[in-house]
Structures are given as C-alpha cells and as structure tokens.
C-alpha cells in the first residue's frame, strides 16, 4: 500500500509526518521548514500561494489572505459572527446560513473546507516530494472537543484536497501516542493542548502499547489567536486615545498589528519585556503616525488574564470526569505553541502539582502521533491499541424541547447504542428525528447536527408504535443514526452530513475545481520559473559580452545575440510567455557554444 501520512491540520501552523525506517519523521516542506503556516492567499494576478509564501505577502494583500480558518470549519455563520468582525478578510453568510470567505481577487466565495483543502494539498505535495512516492491517504488530527459537524467538515476538506482520510484522530490522543510509544510501564498522563485556535485537555492511561482515553474536555474557541487579539485591542485603544484614529478600519494596519502582536507574544515567552515598533502605521493631514510601545510580560498577562483563567475549567472538568485528583497524574505533556507562554505553564503546574514534561516538541508532537496512527493503519507499526472517547453527549429532541441522551460524553469509541421512542399523537404516521450534541438538558442549549424523517408508521394510538433509534459512532467520532419502526420494519438510516454544511455533490464539485486550479497553479509556477531563468540567463550573457568572455564570437553573432536579448527583455516586461519561451530557446541556441567554450573542462 502507498505511504499513509499523518497531518496535524492546525489553526496557525500545520505539520505532516510519516513513518520512515519504523520511526515517525516530520517532513520538511519545500521552503525548508518543518511547520507550514495554515495560510492561503490569492494574489491580484490570481496566483495561489500557500504557507510561508502566503504569509510573507499578507500585509500588502490582507483581504485576500486567509488564516485561522480552522476556527470556522463545520460551523454556521451565526456561531462565529463576533469573531469574524476582527479579521482583515471578509466572512459572510450564504443563503443557507453557511460560512463563506470572500476572495475579491478571484471574485469568488470559498467555504472554510476549500481553504483548508489548499493547506492539505500543499502538505501532501511536500510529502510526495520528500518521500519520492505518491501519497493518496492520510490520518488527520482534530481537536478532541470538535463536534460531529467539525469532524465531518475536516473529512470533506481532505476529499476536496484529493486524498482519502483513513482516520480522524484527536490531537491530545495523537500527542499521547508520540509521547508513550516506547513506554512499557503504565502511566496516567494529562495532555494539555493549547494551539492557535483551540484548547483541549485529555487524560489517558498509557503503557505497554495500550492508549486508553479516560476523559476529555476543552474549548474550541480558545487559543493563541485570542491572546494576539487581546494585544491588538490594547494597541488599537491606546493609539485611538493618543491619536484619535481607529486603526480597525484600515485592513493593512490591522494585519500589521496582528503580526506584531503575535511576535511580541512569542518574544515574551523568553524575555521580560519587548517593544512593539510599527512605523508609518497610518497618516493624517499632519503627517505619518507611528506606534512604539513597550510591553512587559506582566502587562501581557494582565491583558490576557481572562483567557488564562478559561484554561482552568477544562482541566478541572477532565480530572473530575476521570475520577482523579492531582496525585493520580504521573506526567503532564504540553502540546501547541501557546503552551510556551510562562503563565500557562505556571497554571498547569498549579492545577496538576506536576512540572510539565518538555521532552516532546509541542509544535510537532501531534503530527508525529498522527504518523504513528497512519503507520498502524498501513501495517508498519503493530502491537498498539488505541481507545479514544467521544467528547460530547449525543441524543435526540423529545417532547417539551428536551434533549434525551443516548451516548454520554467520554464514552469509548467506536460505540453503538439504541433506545425505544414512540409517537406523541394518535394516528401519527411520521416522526422527525432531531439529532443533538452537547451537555444541556434543553434543546436550544445544544448543537443541532441535523434532522430526518421516518415515514410510513402504521396508524395507532399515541405511545403504541415502537421506534428504535440507534446511534453508531465510528472510530473517527463521526455519527450515523438509524430510526426503525419495529412493527412495519420501516427504516431510515443517515450519516449526519447536513451538519458539515456541505453536500456530497458540493464536495465533489470543489474537488474538481481544486484539481483544475492545481493544473493552473502548476502552469503558473512553470511560467514564473521560466521568467526567473530567462532573466538570469540574459544577465549572464550580457555580462560575458561586456567583459569579452563570450569565446570565439564574431561581430555579427554578437549583434544577433544582442537583438535576441532585446526581444526577450521586451517579452519579459510584457509577460508574453509564448514570446519569452521562443526567444529564450533562440538565445540559448545562439550562445551555448560560446558560453561553454569559456568554461574550462573538468
């Protein structure tokens, strides 16, 4: 079977890893880095950029540079309305209430799944190059607290990217695989995973090849992005108080502020104070305005104190659900770049009574764990048993707007459970099954995963028909629901797809479009490389001509070469690629003999 890779599809950065020689290995990307920014951009020339290249141009192309999209995947527009207001790019609601990301350079709206798919495509392309073989299958990680909609949407993103997602695995569980792969002695570990946009806590028993999740808790709207936003708000308010200008109206200024806030946050993990320096942040009739602001670690912590406090509740909840106190935890493993914040490390130590284990790289450990899971599925790693849990309770709406739970949170998956229900009125011939996920008793307090109808129920007094509802959660944590009327045998079976916001046909259409753009992007890359090569070749030939190093070249030949260079330069300046190719080939034919004659033989 082809190599199966593990992908940590992160909010801020993404990582891909694979099993090499029996060991998990992080794959270096085309730019030479082990992490790839989860950023996608479309330039004014409609060129697609992903990762580091997209990040570099984000200030000058802020409205077409899309980052932190993972926070929107599998969500409805109303769920993220406040958060979307703080972004330099536009997030809109379509006619179905779904999230769309507006791309003005293409005059097109993208779903979050499509943007995430471009990040996955980049990771897969880098993996193919590194491994020297085709890659068509992957294990992708998600936050443990992702609901069914978000998990299904992640699978859809993989499909749009053109890969088969063999398994969805929870990020803390993946981290535990990486940490505990060689552990023989049983340990109870707490994984504290604070990334760019999400926060999870999982408690697991690890040892002798068995990884059993005891409990999980989290917050899918808490991460490093929120710390950055707290700093941006402080800078904006301070600047407005001093200068009377609101910088949030300026897209480029907002992007510069965001980048400066992230940089300052990272610096304060190592030093006690830093300076945020943003010259020419804006201008008015009196001239240019600048920001030069000192920020201490103490001030940063006070600005983010409410965010730090929010990290406390899931830890306490996970311990309670696992029926453990501090003494029951042997090791604490930190995951995610945001765990480098000293105040976070201090909080973890105070809650667990343990100094965090720093033997794993918090940026890479999840991808390594995903690669181990990929290796298990590909048969490259054996003797590993992974027992994960569902993070949230699942149930159906019953009379009075109440949620009746069929599967409780922290139930080991895969799992299948059934319960009998009946009709609420005499001679009722159909029932609507409203599937919910969450912990509240009332329907309105939970996430709606979808509705479907069971038709053809024989007429009978209310309460007599027996309708068996079965919930089946697979190893990816994705739910299928079956409703069956026992007397007639009428049955309706659905995988909860509506919650992912994309239909199967939409996913297929997006895959076709992504593949079409992949061809266009390849052509654009080839054109760009040709321009670079042709320009460099012109420079080299002109240098040789001017220094008299063109070998035995007649005056007529020199004149012909100069004319071709002139034609090629004109083609380059007008971006006439057909003419560039023709003139470049002509120039090489004319000059190769003379250039080679100036190079001594080896």
UniProtKB/Swiss-Prot annotation:
Pfam families: HSP70. GO terms for molecular function: ATP binding; ATP hydrolysis activity; ATP-dependent protein folding chaperone; heat shock protein binding; protein folding chaperone; unfolded protein binding. It is found in: Plastid, Chloroplast. Keywords: ATP-binding, Chaperone, Chloroplast, Nucleotide-binding, Plastid. Signal peptide: none annotated. One of its GO terms (cellular component) is cytoplasm. SUPFAM superfamilies: Actin-like ATPase domain (SSF53067), Heat shock protein 70kD (HSP70), C-terminal subdomain (SSF100934), Heat shock protein 70kD (HSP70), peptide-binding domain (SSF100920). NCBIfam families: PRK00290.1, PRK05183.1, prok_dnaK. Acts as a chaperone. This is Chaperone protein dnaK. It comes from Thalassiosira pseudonana. The lineage of its organism: Eukaryota, Sar, Stramenopiles, Ochrophyta, Bacillariophyta. The gene is dnaK.
